[in-house]
Amino acid sequence: MMQATTKQIGNYVAHSGIRTSGYGYQFWMQPEGGFSCSGMGSQYALMYPEQDLVVITTADAQGLNNAEDFIRESFLKNILHGCQAEALPEDPEAQAKLAEASVLHLPKIEGELTSPWAAKANGVKYVFDDNRWGFKWMKLDFSDNAVQLTYEKHGQVDSFPLYIGEYGPEFLFPEKAAGKRIDILDTNYRCMSQAAWDLENTLVGNVFAVDDYLGCIKIQFTFVEDTMTIFATRWAENFFNDWRGYLAGHAVKE
């Protein structure tokens, strides 16, 4: 066990940030004498034997750049370096702040709530060039607090909302993914979404799976004259697979 939790190899070239302290046997070395287990999406166990300290995080930070460094460096600064031999006195104000900070939050896109393009693109059908993901067309229907995406992919017409400004109620993502068995696509995941106008002609949205499986889609719509260009990235394990890359669509009259 001593060898497993001790630096056996260096990993400076292959990694960056907090992960450059070396690697043992299935354990990552931590700065200042600790070691850790690292799971997907910022699920960590940070262990410091000298301080008799273990910290567990169960975050889902997929798609958030530098989240791992932020979590681990905040731990070093605010917890490890603040350790004392005796317990701190009761501090109701600090406990109230901790309770507020510990509530789960989803990252919010900042931007404008509307744009002239909301009216211009409302209900317009955009037909895509041939693409590897099978998208044929998409249209966006804007209301006061949401935009409904309707699209055809692989011969199936589906739809889901992006809520403008704030996260709206949960909804079932229309494309089925794995449920109890990873090889059977029979489950629609519960999701939450939010969007905002980043530029006058650019709408940006997030879709987060908040079910037994966690993951997210980041999607950007850019409108120029009669075209809509989509850029999407997905951070998920074995689902949201078609929501990545670029799509170019042209407006057509129905």
Regions found by a protein language model. Give the residues of each.
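Intrinsic structural disorder
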Residues: 1-6, 17-20, 237-249
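Active-site Gly/Thr loop motif
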Residues: 2-58
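A generic "cationic amphipathic patch" detector
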Residues: 17, 65-67, 139, 208
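Peripheral terminal and inter-domain segments
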Residues: 89-254
